[in-house]
Design a protein with these regions (language model features):
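Conserved MFS/SLC helix-loop-helix module at the cytosolic interface between two early adjacent transmembrane helices
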Residues: 65-104
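Helix-loop-helix hairpin linking two adjacent transmembrane segments in secondary transporters
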Residues: 134-135, 142-193
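Juxtamembrane intracellular "pre-TM" segments in multi-pass secondary transporters
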Residues: 2-10, 190-222
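Cytoplasmic helix-loop-helix junction between adjacent transmembrane helices
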Residues: 109-147
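Helix-breaking motifs and short loop linkers at transmembrane-helix boundaries and internal kinks
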Residues: 46, 78, 99-104, 133, ...
């Protein structure tokens, strides 16, 4: 085995940083840039409620299905090439959505985007593990912060761009970042794996690894944590404005500002949480903070919504700090590249697989009871569900260690 050229390693890592940042930005901006433009799009062609409902359901569905398939794609085509195809699908979908001539074209473009995002979500922790195994906390901070920025930025500027240049430009402008992100991954995909980066685990991937995740407590704990974070986030993005209007008596405009506050709370968490987990080993205290905040936030909206809606929303928005915690833990709770991909795929596909029923389930429950009591109680229960998962993750065992203790050699 030849010794890697230090200059080639350095260049590979620089390309990887740029690629990871642009990938992370595209994974969230593609999701967050559409809904503010429905009114503007509706002036050009009809947007049936059924199609809008499908567009709202497609993201978690695609994240679950394609997250499940991502490990197989990576085994077959390799990490860089799979990343390249996923990001290409996002870029192509953004262009297709901007060029849509009817609601079904919009749906097709969105489905293509979310399929790429579903695969990309799984691959990002594996990319960090491969290229920056000794800097997992730092790189996770970089890309989760990028994700946080690209979540709240598009809704803020989508309408102004549409007013100035049209809704097609407002949708299509985000494709620039996806296309730019293709460049480093093309270079890294073409380069030999042996020369792409140092300290890379190149063992032959095993098709059995993903199947083992179903039998490991840490894998299930991460899946439950991912579900708790994504369920609260997606339910809030879908229903929090209406909950606030109905229960706290705020105006729709104020409710929109409060929803932005909910999203903005994730930014400081993305800056701090990965470092606390990777460098300090702080895990269970973060779970306690997140769980307690979720209980207090949903509980406040339940028993005294009008007294301090800003406080309740800020508290509820604290629970998704579990998202960067999960992404950091995926790299820290594995020894091998293959296990990292499998664990990321398992946690995200299971988490999103259950989450996709939350927004529509909350809507059905509200219609059946004509009240927000039951949905808020469910959010309290989900917040509490994270605590036992935190106890398991705090044990600091890798999935390989768990398997070896229970079943013998990995």
């Amino acid at each position: 085995m030849t010794t890697p050229d230090p200059l080639a390693v350095r260049r590979g890592r620089i390309l990887a940083v740029v690629g990871i940042v642009l990938l992370a930005f595209s994974l969230r901006s593609a999701v967050a840039s559409l809904s503010p433009l429905f009114d503007a799009i509706g002036e050009d062609f009809d947007l049936p409620a059924a199609v809008l409902g499908l567009i709202g359901t497609v993201p978690p569905l695609c994240f679950a299905v394609f997250g499940l398939l991502a490990a197989g794609f990576e085994r077959r085509f390799g990490l860089e090439r799979t990343t390249l195809v996923a990001l290409g699908a996002v870029g192509l979908g953004l262009v297709a959505r901007a060029a849509a001539l009817d609601a079904y074209g919009l749906l097709f473009g969105s489905a293509l985007i979310f399929a790429g995002v579903g695969v990309g979500n799984v691959l990002v922790p594996a990319l960090v593990k491969k290229y920056f195994a000794e800097r997992i906390g730092l790189l996770t901070t970089v890309y989760t912060t990028t994700m946080a920025v690209s979540t709240f930025l598009p809704p803020l500027i989508a309408v102004p761009i549409a007013d100035a240049a049209g809704w097609r430009t407002s949708l299509g402008v985000w494709a620039v970042f996806a296309v730019a992100g293709l460049i480093p991954w093309i270079v890294l995909a073409v380069r030999s794996r042996r020369a792409a980066a140092a300290d890379v685990d190149l063992e032959a991937p095993s098709t059995r690894v993903f199947g083992r995740m179903w039998r490991l407590p840490t894998a299930w704990a991460l899946a439950i944590t991912f579900f708790a974070s994504s369920a609260v986030a997606y339910t809030s993005f879908a229903w929090l404005p209406k909950i606030l209007v109905d229960t706290a008596g705020v105006t729709p405009q104020v409710a929109g500002v409060l929803l932005s506050l909910f999203a903005l709370i994730g930014l400081p968490a993305s800056l701090v949480v990965p470092a606390l987990v990777a460098r300090r080993g702080v895990v269970l205290p973060l779970f306690i903070v997140a769980s307690a905040s979720g209980v207090l936030g949903a509980g406040g909206l339940l028993v005294a919504p009008a007294s301090a809606p800003w406080l309740w929303v800020a508290l509820l928005g604290t629970l998704p700090l579990l998202f960067p915690l999960v992404l950091t833990s995926v790299g820290l709770r594995t020894r091998t590249h293959d296990a990292t991909v499998a664990l990321s795929a398992f946690a995200q596909s299971v988490g999103y697989g259950v989450t996709m029923f939350m927004p529509i389930g909350v809507g059905i429950l509200h219609d059946a009871t004509d009240s927000w009591t039951a949905p808020l109680v469910i959010l309290i229960g989900i917040s509490l569900l994270a605590l036992p998962a935190g106890v398991v993750i705090a044990r600091r065992k890798t999935v390989e260690q768990e398997w070896e203790q229970r079943h013998g050699s990995w």
